[in-house]
């Protein structure tokens, strides 16, 4: 189960990525990171860029294309079947922390995410201040503040 400590640890990374399909919720989370002046890379295999408030930001097709994966925390906004592949790649690359938005995980995803040594921080599930569980849009500022980034 995620805690304030796991959320805080997520935000200790110097780099961030948002992995998901090009949908409103993915764009909203990416914009949230930009609004908070965090170094964020959008990850989307189907789009070369994303536009936020009239400015284009280049995407990368997968986590392997991130410049510093071992220093990057990743927000995941995908269907559970897709999340499994994202987690497998993240684990292989040594990504330290993941934040799985509500609706992105099931039992098989949690088994992989919570496997011993897979990640140093996994934020997911019940808790946080939102009614659907831990959400970076709802709980991110508090965790950033606790990590000294606000």
Each language-model region and where it sits:
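Rossmann-fold NAD(P) dinucleotide-binding segment
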Residues: 82-99
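Short N-terminal or domain-adjacent regulatory/targeting segments
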Residues: 1-13
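Rossmann-fold NAD(P)-binding glycine/threonine-rich loop
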Residues: 102-140
């Amino acid at each position: 189960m995620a805690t304030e400590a796991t959320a805080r640890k997520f935000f200790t990374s110097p780099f961030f990525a948002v992995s998901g399909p090009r949908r409103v919720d993915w764009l909203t989370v990416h914009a949230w990171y930009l609004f908070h002046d965090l170094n964020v890379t959008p990850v989307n295999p189907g789009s070369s860029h994303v536009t936020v408030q009239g400015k284009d930001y280049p995407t990368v097709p997968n986590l392997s294309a991130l410049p510093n994966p071992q220093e990057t925390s990743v927000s995941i906004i995908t269907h559970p079947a897709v999340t499994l592949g994202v987690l497998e790649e993240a684990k292989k690359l040594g990504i330290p922390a993941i934040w799985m938005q509500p609706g992105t995980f099931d039992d098989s995803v949690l088994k992989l995410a919570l496997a011993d040594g897979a990640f140093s921080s996994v934020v997911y599930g019940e808790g946080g201040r939102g009614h659907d569980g831990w959400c970076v849009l709802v709980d991110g500022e508090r965790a950033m503040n606790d990590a000294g980034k606000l």
